[in-house]
From Swiss-Prot:
Mg(2+) 2 binds at E67. It is found in: Cytoplasm. The keyword Cytoplasm applies. This is Crossover junction endodeoxyribonuclease RuvC. Mg(2+) 1 binds at D7, D139. Its main location: cytoplasm. Binds 2 Mg(2+) ion per subunit. Gene3D superfamilies: Ribonuclease H-like superfamily/Ribonuclease H (3.30.420.10). InterPro entries: RNaseH-like_sf (IPR012337), RNaseH_sf (IPR036397), X-over_junc_endoDNase_Mg_BS (IPR020563), X-over_junc_endoDNase_RuvC (IPR002176).
Length: 169
């Protein structure tokens, strides 16, 4: 099963695709979609959306996951990030994919083991878990981490559902 992780940003949106087979996770592809800061906000959002649509067509994931937005000190920046996140999430949603959302601390804990991990720790762990991943940027590493987090949580939810269905009340 292919899963897409997305790390939204207005300037750079990271994406990563993994293949999950049983309890094995493999790297498929990763990269970034960049928007041109000389363009209007609407045009930049369209660039991000179009880039993610292209990723969906190229790699055909069956589910997607995205990091939740944190609120920073600058309300205008937070608003723009939220708009970018919406444009990015819209692409898999319109393609009929489930789009899961995870807090940054949950993603870090799932991949590194601690919710307060630094970006370089996340990148190092991604390189360990996914040998051969090129990791164009930290944004791509974060996107792969989000996909891995979703794979872990999805597997846990599936195990719980199977246990309940089997009479494990």
């Amino acid at each position: 099963m292919r899963l897409l992780g997305l790390d939204p940003g207005l300037r750079i949106t990271g994406w990563g695709v993994i293949e999950v087979t049983g309890n094995r996770i493999g790297h498929v592809a990763d990269g970034v979609v960049r928007s041109d800061d000389r363009l209007s906000l609407a045009a930049r959002l369209a660039q991000l959306h179009g880039g993610i649509v292209a990723v969906l067509k190229a790699y055909e994931p069956v589910e997607a996951a995205v990091e939740e937005t944190f609120v920073n000190r600058n309300p205008a920046s937070t608003l723009k990030l939220g708009q970018a996140r919406g444009a990015v999430m819209l692409a898999p949603a319109l393609a009929g994919l489930v789009v899961a959302e995870y807090q940054p601390s949950v993603v870090k804990k799932a991949v590194v083991g601690t919710g307060g991990a630094a970006k370089d720790q996340v990148g190092m762990m991604i390189r360990t878990l996914l040998p051969g991943a090129t990791l164009e940027t930290a944004d791509a590493a974060d996107a792969l981490a989000i996909a891995i987090c979703h794979a872990h949580y999805r597997a846990g939810a599936l195990s719980l559902a199977l246990a309940r269905a089997g009479g494990g009340r």
